[in-house]
């Protein structure tokens, strides 16, 4: 990230910096009280903070649910490309919803916020990496609502400041990240087969 964009705290390439709210098309937090819908043989998934880390969403140990057919479920059902950010406990963990996760039928809990961005200007994976950088982490810490129980609200998320390079450069970065991820999978598979 730093090699391509420079240190975001310094912004040596002098990219424009704006509040995230300028690029948010949809913003919601997850559902409370879904324990009654969580079952071992549920047909859909329920994302919690433990699934969101390092700009990714892990399907390992994903909670199974049978979601209700109501407005709350429709509001908290994720779509491909949604950016998820933890807003309680371990603040600022990020992940981007993949096609596989979205197609499975997946919802978020109350400890996460779901953001749909204007993808013509900001790539969600670029934003995830920015938020996981030192510059992003410092903002989460400064906006933390309480010293006793960590938490962020919609205003905190909307007011996050982000460096906005041209979308072509963001896409180049995302292509590189995806290629590295593919290479890691190939190496891991080879290691697993060697054992």
Describe the predicted segments one by one:
Residues 104-113, 125, 145-171:
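A short glycine-rich beta-alpha junction/loop motif
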Residues 48, 73-132, 149:
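A short beta-sheet element
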Residues 51-64, 106:
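Short, basic/aromatic beta-hairpin or loop at an interaction surface
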Residues 13-56, 71-73, 145:
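Low-complexity, Lys/Gly-biased intrinsically disordered segments
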Residues 43, 61, 109-111:
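A generic structural signal for short beta-strands and their flanking turns/coil linkers
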Residues 136-140:
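Periplasmic-binding protein-like
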Residues 1-31, 159, 163-171, 178-195:
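Non-catalytic DNA-recognition/assembly elements of restriction-modification systems
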């Amino acid at each position: 990230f730093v090699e391509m964009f420079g240190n975001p705290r310094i912004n040596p390439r002098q990219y424009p910096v704006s509040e995230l709210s300028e690029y948010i098309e949809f913003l919601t937090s997850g559902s409370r009280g879904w324990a009654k819908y969580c079952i071992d043989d549920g047909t859909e998934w329920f994302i919690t903070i433990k699934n969101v880390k390092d700009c990714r969403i892990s399907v390992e140990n994903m909670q199974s649910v049978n979601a209700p057919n109501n407005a709350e479920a429709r509001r908290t059902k994720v779509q491909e490309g949604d950016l998820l950010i933890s807003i309680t406990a371990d603040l600022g963990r990020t992940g981007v919803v993949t096609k596989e996760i979205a197609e499975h039928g997946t919802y978020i809990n109350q400890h996460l916020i779901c953001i749909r961005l204007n993808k013509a200007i900001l790539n969600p994976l670029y934003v995830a990496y920015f938020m996981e950088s030192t510059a992003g982490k410092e903002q989460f810490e400064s906006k933390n609502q309480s010293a006793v129980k960590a938490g962020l609200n919609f205003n905190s998320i909307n007011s996050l400041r982000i460096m906005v390079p041209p979308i072509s450069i963001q896409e180049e970065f995302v292509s590189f990240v995806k290629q590295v991820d593919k290479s890691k999978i190939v190496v891991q598979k080879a290691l697993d087969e060697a054992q």
